[in-house]
Amino acid sequence: MQERDILLKIKEIAKAKNFKTELDESVLQKPFRELKIDSLDMFSVIVSLEKEFDIMFEDEKLMQLNNLAELIAEVKHLISQKGV
């Protein structure tokens, strides 16, 4: 799966959950806190991504995710590990 496809899915989730910030390529490196995305918002995105892609984030790894680019990279990694 390509990063762009993952970003599109995250954008769909954010829109469905009425996020105030538009999540697109222009904000990939901005910290979540600058985007006004709090822990509850992140939790809902993570749960939706786990269901959508049949993946499971490790709690320790979640604590290290600081921006959208890192989240996309981790989703891509977890998807690639499913076939192993």
Curated annotation (Swiss-Prot):
Cysteine pairings via disulfide bonds: none
Alphabetized UniProt keyword annotations: Fatty acid biosynthesis, Fatty acid metabolism, Lipid biosynthesis, Lipid metabolism, Phosphopantetheine, Phosphoprotein
Keyword Lipid metabolism recorded: yes
GO-annotated biological processes: fatty acid biosynthetic process
Short name of one Pfam family: PP-binding
Residues with the O-(pantetheine 4'-phosphoryl)serine modification: S39
PTM summary: 4'-phosphopantetheine is transferred from CoA to a specific serine of the apo-ACP-like protein.
Residue ranges annotated for the Carrier domain, each copy included: 4-79
InterPro entries assigned: ACP-like_sf, PP-bd_ACP
Pathway: Lipid metabolism; fatty acid biosynthesis
Role, per record: Carrier of the growing fatty acid chain in fatty acid biosynthesis.
Protein name, as recorded: Acyl carrier protein homolog
Naturally occurring in which organism (per UniProt): Mycoplasma pneumoniae (strain ATCC 29342 / M129 / Subtype 1)
